[in-house]
Each structure stands twice: as C-alpha cells, then as structure tokens.
Curated annotation (Swiss-Prot):
The keyword Phosphoprotein does not apply. Residues 317-350 are annotated as: Disordered. This is Heat shock 70 kDa protein 13. GO terms for molecular function: ATP binding; ATP-dependent protein folding chaperone. Has peptide-independent ATPase activity. It comes from Mus musculus (Mouse). The lineage of its organism: Eukaryota, Metazoa, Chordata, Craniata, Vertebrata. Residues 317-330 have a biased composition (Basic and acidic residues). SUPFAM superfamilies: Actin-like ATPase domain.
C-alpha cells in the first residue's frame, strides 16, 4: 500500500512539474475571445492574455488604439474609422456617425424630428425605427445595425491581424440603459460582421472590472462616463462579485464635442475681428476642428497650447457672425474681460496656388481660457451625479469609489469639479479612454476560459430601472 501511495505521489508531482514547465517555457495560447467597446464617438477592441493576465488593447494599422465610430459611403467603397473622419467635411451627407444613439431604439415621429436637425445626413423614420439615406452611385437606405456592423468588422479585422488567426467570438459592452431590443440589435450588428456574441456586459460594470473593483471590498461605486458626445452616470451596488445598477442619469448632448465647439466659436470670433472674414472652405474648417481637438488634448497636460492654421481670405463679411457655428455665445467671454488669448497675428498676406490671398492665423490658448469658455458645461456634469444620489437614497459621503471613464474626464478642471463635490479624489488609476474596453476584454478572457482565473462580474437585472436624462 505504501508503495502504491509513493508511486501515486510521484505521478502527481511529475504532473505538477510538467504543468509548471509548460507555463514557463511553452508559448502561451492565443486568446480566442475578443472584447469590444462599441462607443458612440470612438470604439476599440482588446484581448486578455492567458498566463500573464494582461489586457492588450489592439491598435489599427496606424497605431491608433481606438477608431472614430464613423462610416462613410462613396461611389466606390465604404470607409470606416479614421478614413471616414477624413471624409467627414467633404462628404458630410454620406458620413454616418452617432449610429449607437439610434440602434434598436423606438422613436415617435416627433422624437426623431427633434434629433435629425443635429446631423448633416438624412435620418428617416421607418416603422418606429431610424434609418439613414446615403447617396453614392444611387440612393440607398442603411440601418444603424448595418453601420454598426461595418465598425465591428473593422475591429474584428484589427484583432485578426494582431492575433494572426480568425476571430469568431466576442463579448461586447452596451450602455446600462439599453433595453432588450437595443441589446439584440447590437448583437445583430455583430452577427452581420461575422461575430458570435457570448455575452453583453453593461459599460459601467466593465469599467468597474477594469479598476479591479470586482475583486475588492467596496459597496457603492459611482461611474462617471464622459465621452465625446454623451455623459452617463451610474450608481452600482456591489455585493460580492455581483453588480446591481441602482440608478442612472446623464446628458445625451454633453461631451468633448461641446467643449471643442465653444473653443471653435471663440477662434471664429478672433479670426473675424482680425481679418474681417470667416473660414468657409471645408478643408480649412476641417483643419480648424483638428487644431481645436489637439489644443484640448494638449491642455490636459500643459498650461497653454498653440493654434496655427493657414486660411484663405474670402470676401469680407459686412457684419459680425450671427447664430450658428460662428457665433460666440452671449454668456461667454468677450475681448477685454481679462481672459483674452495671447494672439500672434500675421496680417501679411501670401498667395496660394489658386491666386487667392492667404493668412497664417496663430494664437495661444491657455488652459484658463479653455476652462472659462466651458465652465457652465463643466458644472452641468454635477446635475446627473446629484440625481443618481437622490434616486439611490444616498449621501455623497457614502460612495466608496468614484471612477472615471471616457476621454473627456482627462480635463483637469472636470476632475477638480468632481473632487470638490465629493471631497476626495476620484479613482484615476486606469486610462479613462480604455476603461470599458479593458473590462470587456477581462470578461472575454473569463468567458474564453483563460487563466489565471478571474472573478467574473455577475450583473443583477433591474427591470424597473430608468435613466433620467438632462439634455
């Protein structure tokens, strides 16, 4: 008997040693399930690597770890992501964005009519659903699901290129307020892209997983997700590894695009006051928008940033800009208020190849100016925060963790507003741009059976939950 036990013990030790050596020296298995964050403004894809427990957010062919959620239709092809972004100003009527706002959602004709004025492309009302009309060689009707499928196909191809193998399975995130039809429509979009969805996870839960909160002892988690076009605030109640969404609120028309617009309006006014005209060429407006986005990004780490754009002198306008894109809102800063930018004007004219005169508009934008232009918008972030606390019957001091999601939460003044409200610093240990995709990738690894084993996040459905919107 003793001899048999010795043999058995030796066999077990041999197996353990073989397993250890395999983990140390054999190539790690390739991830089989990808995690997708299909965002309103940007989308991304990631994988969880067995053995190391690391998440890799997969870049596109140019090194971008997220791509714009935009799809352009032309006579010859369909362009996605950054290629679509480049066509947005020259082909606006055929460049679809914000499709996530429409996917699977039921609209009354009046509700949809209130939305369509915000977009340069045609939005149609078909049997309670939104569809898009685009014109290439002919006019075609495309659904939000089809637009989403083109984005998902691009993400799938990025993952396949990186992993060097076909990908068929995915976990995908959706807003917590998505109903069953919106979730099923998102799955349908994935199916059109050749993906089988193993699980749909709520974005706030995914973010909490990225921060590791599914493995630590916290009870109440507030997730603030501020992206390019929307603000979502979710109150999560964590019990063990289970997450219950207690309350949701937000603003579907507040995000980084709005902050950009305030600065763009300010620059338009500077240009008009200096040169007496407003930029009207699509490519120059596009360059101005790109410059504004770059300024916003630079101001997250620097106190000031430069704008330098070559503009073609058009016919001089007889009056200052009124209404629309070129007007600085009346409640915003005006020259002489002590916060003016430090302008560097080059009034000397040069000639372009077309014979038109050109000027180089240069200016320095301070963080102080950017914050002042947007302070009222920054304060609006607190409104849905206060609402979820009210609906959750909680005081702000009872929140264990405040986590930030979305690129716009990088703005220092926004972090300061949140810190001042709660009296403590929000958790910023995870890249806010990648929080959701990181969490989804972790869940994809769990569903794919990767090791080391992770604690899965279980979501408790709350069928009575409704999101309060402040638009």
């Amino acid at each position: 008997m003793a001899g048999e036990m010795t043999i058995l013990g030796s066999a077990v030790l041999t197996l353990l040693l073989a397993g250890y050596l395999a983990q140390q020296y054999l190539p790690l298995p390739t991830p089989k399930v990808i995690g997708i964050d299909l965002g309103t403004t940007y989308c991304s894809v990631g994988v969880f690597f067995p053995g190391t427990g690391k998440v890799k957010v997969i870049p596109d062919e140019n090194g971008h770890i997220s791509i714009p959620s935009m799809v352009s239709f032309t006579d010859g092809d369909v362009y996605v992501g950054y290629e679509s972004l480049e066509l947005a100003d020259s082909n606006p009527q055929n460049t679809i964005y914000d499709a996530k706002r429409f996917i699977g959602k039921i609209f009354t004709p009046e509700e949809l009519e209130a939305e369509v004025g915000r977009y340069p492309f045609k939005v149609l009302h078909r049997n309670g659903m939104a569809e898009f009309s685009v014109t290439s060689n002919e006019t075609i009707i495309v659904s939000p699901e089809f637009v989403g499928s083109r984005l998902l196909l691009k993400l799938k191809e990025m993952a396949e290129e990186y992993l060097g193998m076909p990908v068929a399975n995915a976990v995908i995130s959706v807003p917590a307020e998505f109903d069953l039809q919106q979730r099923n429509s998102t799955i349908q979009a994935a199916n059109l892209a050749g993906l089988k969805i193993l699980r749909v996870i709520n974005e706030p839960t995914a973010a909490a997983m990225a921060y590791g909160l599914h493995k630590v002892d916290v009870f109440y988690v507030l997730v603030i997700d501020l992206g390019g076009g929307t603000l979502d605030v979710s109150l999560l109640n964590k019990q063990g590894g289970m997450f219950l969404t207690r309350a949701m609120s937000g603003n579907n028309k507040l995000g980084g695009q709005d902050f950009n617009q305030r600065l763009l309006q300010h620059l338009y006014k500077e240009i008009y006051q200096t040169y007496g005209f407003l930029p009207s060429r699509k490519e120059e407006i596009h360059r101005l928008r790109q410059a504004v986005e770059m300024v916003k990004l630079n101001l997250t780490i620097h106190q000031s940033a430069q704008v330098s754009v070559l503009l073609t002198v058009e016919g001089k306008d007889s009056k200052e800009p009124q209404n629309g894109d070129s007007e600085l809102p009346k409640d915003q800063l005006t020259p002489g208020d002590g916060h003016h930018v430090n302008r560097v004007f080059r009034p000397g004219l040069s000639e372009s190849k077309s014979g038109k005169s050109q000027v180089l508009f240069e200016t320095e934008v301070s963080r102080k100016l950017f914050d002042a232009l947007n302070e009222d918008l920054f304060q609006k972030i607190l409104v849905p925060i206060q609402q979820v606390l009210k609906e959750g019957l909680l005081d702000k001091t009872e929140i264990d963790e405040v986590v930030l999601v979305g690129g716009s939460t990088r703005i220092p003044r926004i972090r300061q507003v949140i810190q001042e409200f709660f009296g403590k610093d929000p958790n910023t240990s995870v890249d806010p741009d990648l929080a959701v995709v990181t969490g989804v990738a972790i869940q994809a690894g769990i569903d794919g059976g990767s090791w080391p084993l992770q604690v899965s996040a279980l979501e408790i459905p709350n069928k009575h939950l409704q999101k309060t919107n402040f638009n």
